[in-house]
Amino acid sequence: MYRDKIYIWVPVWGEKHINMFFDYTLPSLCQKGNLPSLSNYEIVLNIYTLDNDVNRIKEGLSDAYTDLNFKITTKSEMGFHDNDMMLMFYRDILKKSYENRALLVFAQPDLIFSDGSIFNAIELANGKGVSIAAAHPRISTEGVSATDLKKKLKLDQSISSRMLVKLSMDNKHSSLEYASD
C-alpha cells in the first residue's frame, strides 16, 4: 500500500543533543536530495523533548527552517512521569504512524544522512510492505566537530555516502575501536 505521509521522529533534549540536531541532523535531512526531493509527500517533523527545551527548539526551527511542518510533543503533555521517557516517546510515534498510515524515519540527533539517502529509502520501501533498517556507526563527536562537515552543511553542499563512511572510519567511537579485541 502506497503512503503519502512521512513522519520524521526526533527524540531530542539537552543542550548538547539539541546543538547536534541543528548542526548536523537537520541540515543533512534538508539536503536537496532528501526531504526537499519528497515534495509529493506530507512530511511532519515529530520532535519529542522536555518542556524546558521547547523554546530553544522553536527558535532553531524558526531561524532557517520556516518551510518545515513540525510538531513538538513534551514529556508532560503525554502525562507520564516515569523514567522510561524514550520508550514512551517511541510507542507514541509508532502508534501515530500506524494510525495515520505514515512512513516513519528515525532521526536521532547523532545521525547524519547522506544526500539522497532518505529519498532512496522512501522510494525503495513505499508501497512494498517492507521496512528498511540501516545500522549507523558510532563516531567520536570530538572528531566530527573538528572536521569541516558542519561548514559544508551550512553552505548547502552535498554530503555523499562515501564522505560519511570515510568520516566514520577516521573518527571511530572508542567502543567501536576496540570491539574486536
Tell me the role of every PLM-derived stretch:
Residues 2-3, 36-43, 100:
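Short helix-terminating capping/connector loops at secondary-structure junctions
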Residues 99-114:
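Short beta-strand-to-loop acidic/aromatic patch adjacent to the donor-nucleotide binding site
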Residues 81-89, 94-95, 112-181:
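Conserved catalytic core of nucleotide-sugar-dependent glycosyltransferases
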Residues 30-42, 63-74, 126-133:
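Structural alpha-beta junctions
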Residues 48-103:
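Active-site-proximal specificity loops/subdomain of glycosyltransferases
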Residues 6-14, 50, 72-78, 134-136:
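Short loop/turn segments at strand-loop or loop-helix junctions that form parts
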Residues 16-37:
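Short, well-formed alpha-helical segments that are part of the catalytic scaffolds
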Residues 5-10, 29, 42-47:
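Hydrophobic targeting segments
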